[in-house]
Design a protein with these regions (language model features):
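Short, structured interface segments
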Residues: 313-315, 375, 382-388
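Secondary-structure transition/capping motifs at alpha-helix termini
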Residues: 283, 379, 422-424
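N-terminal secretory signal peptides that target proteins for export/translocation
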Residues: 1-9
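N-terminal cap/lid segment of alpha/beta-hydrolase-fold proteins
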Residues: 387-424
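Beta-propeller folds
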Residues: 29-360, 366-369, 376
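Bacterial N-terminal signal peptides
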Residues: 13-24
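Long amphipathic N-terminal alpha/beta scaffold segment
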Residues: 365-366, 374, 382-383, 392-394
Length: 424
């Protein structure tokens, strides 16, 4: 009897296993896993200031390259790559013809490429690249004493594009040491020549430039990892300590200046609950809260896309992306609302805009859409589809994701997402 019972259990187990395997086979046949893990066609994308070109990063096998497309017909005018196991950490248009990019490399067993701190400039018309910052800079060797750029063991990151000066940018530069003091330098994007414009009394600094091109705020931390925020009234003024985390018990990170330069917007920790965006009156030193959500931190800050690059709002993610603005009178607010109406059910974001403000590059994504890029003409109010991140995936064939929440036994609200079967 025991043997017969055991046989029945084994038969039932085998049948259940076969049913489970059959279900898995059906599921595998229904879902093309390869199409979902395949790398996207385009990652970052930006319009040139004049609106003639579109720059984009292309992940390809063991490297990520840069391609420049002519906007009128999307034909490539230039391509650039640094070779095997290299990536592009960031890039930005310096002017209508030159693109600056930060170099990253995949080293050893690292899962992600590591930023090397080197800066390269690429010509948008012929794709020629030249290293301007880093140890591998070609400075002409020992045969010349005139060296506009120099090979140096430093890392650099873009601090500001200086829209009013097409030939210069501000870089955040620091040496490769255990105790780095950063400095702000103005660099000529044609020659690579750099001039120090600011030194600061805090390590690991990040610089904030005002709308006149002056470095006026800096955020950093010393060896105790406690942050400090400094401000100065002008390029000639002394740095003034605005916040010290050791005494205030909160971090205040500078986001940007108001259009008139009199207010510094901050993202601040709060004693309880989510972070807030504060407005610091630089004359009086008074802080006022301008934007805060009841449940979630700001996901990203929204900046004005034309004129002075001032913070005007934030994007929050409490289930689905939504935008809130504290400068409700800014013209960009109306543009954001129009785009949200035009792409109802999706999340449109202004990726970049031409210097005259007419053309805007808009990225649209959702729970079922990996990302579509559109060219939006603000004069005609017409949008033209350019490219998709994953053109082989049809959003209509994707399963929707629904935000869900429930309260745990200890009273904690738990938030998550539920992926629904297609048609379910």
């Amino acid at each position: 009897m025991q043997d017969k019972g055991m046989a029945r259990v084994l038969r039932a187990g085998v049948c259940a296993s076969l049913v489970w395997l059959g279900m898995c086979a059906v599921a595998s046949a229904a879902v093309d896993v390869e199409s979902h893990v395949r790398r996207e066609e385009f990652s970052q994308m930006q319009l040139s200031p004049g609106g003639d070109y579109l720059a984009a990063t292309l992940p390809r096998g063991d490297r990520t390259g840069l391609v420049i497309l002519r906007l009128s017909d999307l034909k490539p005018t230039a391509q650039f790559s640094l070779g095997r196991n290299t990536d592009i950490a960031w890039f930005s248009w310096a002017n209508d013809r030159r693109v600056l990019l930060g170099v990253a490399e995949k080293i050893g067993m690292l899962a992600r490429p590591r930023f090397t701190g080197e800066v390269v400039v690429v010509d948008a018309q012929d794709g020629r690249g030249e290293m301007l910052v880093g140890e591998r800079v070609d400075d002409g060797g020992a045969g010349t004493r005139i060296k506009p750029k120099k090979a140096e063991a430093v890392w650099a990151r873009l601090a500001d594009e200086l829209p009013g000066d097409p030939n210069s940018v501000i870089l955040n530069v620091a040496p490769f040491t255990d105790d780095p003091y950063s400095r702000a330098e103005r660099m000529d994007v044609r020659s690579g020549r750099r001039v120090v414009v600011a030194r600061v009394p805090v390590r690991n600094a990040e610089f904030l430039v005002d709308h006149a091109g002056v470095v006026r705020a800096v955020f950093g931390s010393n060896t105790d990892n406690m942050s400090q925020l400094y401000h100065r009234a002008s390029a000639e003024a002394e740095w003034q300590l605005v916040n010290d985390e050791r005494s205030s018990r909160r971090r205040e990170y500078p986001l940007g200046f108001s259009a008139d330069g009199r207010t510094l917007f901050l993202r601040s920790d709060m004693p309880r609950g989510p972070d807030a965006i504060l407005a610091l009156d630089l004359a009086s030193g008074q802080r006022s809260e301008v934007l805060r959500d009841d449940d979630v931190d700001p996901m990203t800050v929204i900046y004005a896309s034309t004129g002075p690059r001032e913070p005007i709002g934030a994007r929050f993610m409490d289930g689905r992306p939504r935008t809130e603005f504290f400068n409700k009178d800014h013209p960009d607010v109306r543009l954001h609302r129009l785009l949200e109406q035009a792409f109802e059910g999706e999340s449109p974001e202004l990726a970049s805009r031409t210097a005259d403000g007419r053309l805007a590059l808009v990225e649209v994504h959702s729970d079922r859409n990996s990302g579509d890029f559109f060219l939006f003409d603000t004069a005609t109010m017409q949008a033209r589809h350019l490219v998709s991140r994953r053109s082989w995936l049809d959003p209509l064939e994707m399963s929707p994701r629904r935000p869900v929440s429930f309260t745990a036994r200890d009273g904690l609200a738990v938030h998550g997402y539920l992926t629904l079967p297609k048609g379910g």
